[in-house]
Amino acid sequence: MSDQRKEKKLNETNWIINFDKIEDSTRRNYFSVLPQENRLMEHFAEAFVINKPKGRVGGDGFWLHKHDDDVYLALFTCVGEGHLASMMIRIYMNALKKMVEGYSIDFPGSILQFLHREVQARFKDKNNILLNTNANVGIVKLNTSSKKMEFAGANMDLLQVINNEVKIVEGEKNQVGENTETRHSYSSNSLQDAENSSFYLCSSGVFNLIGGPDFKKLSMNQLGDYLLQNKELDLTSQKQLAEQYLTTWTGANRQNDDIMVIGFRA
């Protein structure tokens, strides 16, 4: 082998090693910034998290915060996937940290409004950036004493299983963080009979999964019907069944998006 070819081979090997180190570091950072599943269980009667990035890192994340008797839970799906979407997760997490440390904002709809303005302001003068700054977000507020619950969504809905019924609590159609002049507003919805319900927040990737008997995208109604069939089970068992259901639905097809599902009971 000539010296030039040896040098080229060495450079390629070094590039692969360095890239793998970056990948490993990004993966560690991605998972370290997210709360652990057991933290959810400290604040909800039952809870689970399914987090399956398409690649080594993902663009789905969640945030948990407790203030007095109120617990706040947010799931956000940053547009795109991989490293760039993972970077946006940190930006959204930092914006939420800034909010709780310096502002008295307690309604889920108001939190979405803050997030939208904060991300817009951060990227206002960066028209040529490669990042997609917008995200789908769902936020739940639970008062642990009264068991009252509120929800607000930015292009994200909430599944509620209650008695023998599946309800879809709709959020607004607008995302947060879009770099447009369109005026955004987000309302908070009070949830009925929260103490006797199971709730599920799902990233958009769940409903991008293609498969099933008709080789189509999974719908929220289909997932809701499956969860309803298993409503008597504890959420630990439901998590295992939900993972199996999503895998079976996809079948031999490749996972085409990041997936995150959070289930919880008040």
Locate predicted features.
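N-terminal membrane insertion elements
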Residues: M1-R5
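Acidic beta-to-alpha connecting loop that harbors the catalytic carboxylate
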Residues: V79, G205-V206
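C-terminal catalytic subdomain
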Residues: Q192-Y200, V206-A266
